[in-house]
């Protein structure tokens, strides 16, 4: 006998082997592309930018949200041969704003790692032997 149990936000459904073997009678409903409550990707069906898309990571709503929207919109709607080449001022304004809030908009880790000076490696007896072997085999 199958049954359903609710545990907090979870709904647990137990089915018998017989229940599991019968074909499903569930009907799939096609998504309505014009449903305003339906989640969409970055670009809405009408071509507009979906500022509520989680893919933007909240960039459109932070302290530099207006600068981000301006730069992103300019790039999205750009018709230049080099797409976005007409948006330099908007991207510069966004970058300047983001630099005012380093805790909210941290620099990429790669850039931070490149900025760190490389520490010299101490030569040990093992590295000297390896180097000598390499020189011996290469000549």
From Swiss-Prot:
<dbReference type="GO" id="GO:0005739">
    <property type="term" value="C:mitochondrion"/>
</dbReference>
<keyword id="KW-0676">Redox-active center</keyword>
<keyword id="KW-0813">Transport</keyword>
<dbReference type="GO" id="GO:0015035">
    <property type="term" value="F:protein-disulfide reductase activity"/>
</dbReference>
<feature type="disulfide bond" description="Redox-active">
    <location>
        <begin position="53"/>
        <end position="55"/>
    </location>
</feature>
<dbReference type="GO" id="GO:0043504">
    <property type="term" value="P:mitochondrial DNA repair"/>
</dbReference>
<dbReference type="InterPro" id="IPR010625">
    <property type="entry name" value="CHCH"/>
</dbReference>
<keyword id="KW-0496">Mitochondrion</keyword>
<dbReference type="GO" id="GO:0072655">
    <property type="term" value="P:establishment of protein localization to mitochondrion"/>
</dbReference>
<keyword id="KW-1015">Disulfide bond</keyword>
<dbReference type="GO" id="GO:0034599">
    <property type="term" value="P:cellular response to oxidative stress"/>
</dbReference>
<dbReference type="GO" id="GO:0046825">
    <property type="term" value="P:regulation of protein export from nucleus"/>
</dbReference>
<dbReference type="GO" id="GO:0160203">
    <property type="term" value="P:mitochondrial disulfide relay system"/>
</dbReference>
<feature type="short sequence motif" description="Cx9C motif 2">
    <location>
        <begin position="87"/>
        <end position="97"/>
    </location>
</feature>
<dbReference type="InterPro" id="IPR039289">
    <property type="entry name" value="CHCHD4"/>
</dbReference>
<dbReference type="GO" id="GO:1990830">
    <property type="term" value="P:cellular response to leukemia inhibitory factor"/>
</dbReference>
<keyword id="KW-0653">Protein transport</keyword>
<feature type="region of interest" description="Disordered">
    <location>
        <begin position="102"/>
        <end position="139"/>
    </location>
</feature>
<protein>
    <recommendedName>
        <fullName>Mitochondrial intermembrane space import and assembly protein 40</fullName>
    </recommendedName>
</protein>
<dbReference type="GO" id="GO:1901857">
    <property type="term" value="P:positive regulation of cellular respiration"/>
</dbReference>
<feature type="disulfide bond">
    <location>
        <begin position="74"/>
        <end position="87"/>
    </location>
</feature>
<keyword id="KW-0811">Translocation</keyword>
<feature type="domain" description="CHCH">
    <location>
        <begin position="61"/>
        <end position="105"/>
    </location>
</feature>
<comment type="function">
    <text>Central component of a redox-sensitive mitochondrial intermembrane space import machinery which is required for the biogenesis of respiratory chain complexes. Functions as chaperone and catalyzes the formation of disulfide bonds in substrate proteins, such as COX17, COX19, MICU1 and COA7. Required for the import and folding of small cysteine-containing proteins (small Tim) in the mitochondrial intermembrane space (IMS). Required for the import of COA7 in the IMS. Precursor proteins to be imported into the IMS are translocated in their reduced form into the mitochondria.</text>
</comment>
<feature type="short sequence motif" description="Cx9C motif 1">
    <location>
        <begin position="64"/>
        <end position="74"/>
    </location>
</feature>
<dbReference type="Pfam" id="PF06747">
    <property type="entry name" value="CHCH"/>
</dbReference>
<comment type="subunit">
    <text>Monomer. Can form homooligomers. Interacts with GFER and forms transient disulfide bonds with GFER. Interacts with MICU1. Interacts with COX19 forming transient intermolecular disulfide bridges. Interacts with COA7 through transient intermolecular disulfide bonds. Interacts with AIFM1; the interaction increases in presence of NADH. Interacts with NDUFB10.</text>
</comment>
<feature type="compositionally biased region" description="Acidic residues">
    <location>
        <begin position="106"/>
        <end position="124"/>
    </location>
</feature>
<dbReference type="GO" id="GO:0005758">
    <property type="term" value="C:mitochondrial intermembrane space"/>
</dbReference>
<keyword id="KW-0560">Oxidoreductase</keyword>
<dbReference type="GO" id="GO:0033108">
    <property type="term" value="P:mitochondrial respiratory chain complex assembly"/>
</dbReference>
<feature type="disulfide bond">
    <location>
        <begin position="64"/>
        <end position="97"/>
    </location>
</feature>
């Amino acid at each position: 006998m199958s049954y359903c149990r609710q545990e907090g936000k979870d709904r647990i459904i137990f089915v018998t082997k017989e229940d599991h073997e019968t074909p499903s009678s569930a009907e799939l409903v096609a998504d309505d592309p014009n449903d305003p409550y339906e989640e969409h990707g970055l670009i809405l069906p009408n071509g507009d930018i979906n500022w509520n898309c989680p893919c933007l990571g909240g960039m459109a709503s932070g302290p530099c949200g207006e600068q981000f929207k301006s730069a992103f919109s300019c790039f999205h709607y750009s018709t230049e041969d080099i797409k976005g080449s007409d948006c330099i001022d908007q991207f510069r304004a966004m970058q300047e704003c983001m630099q005012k809030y380093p805790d909210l908009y941290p620099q990429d880790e790669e850039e931070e790692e490149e900025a760190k000076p490389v520490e010299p490696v101490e030569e040990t007896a093992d590295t000297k032997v390896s180097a000598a072997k390499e020189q011996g085999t290469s000549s």
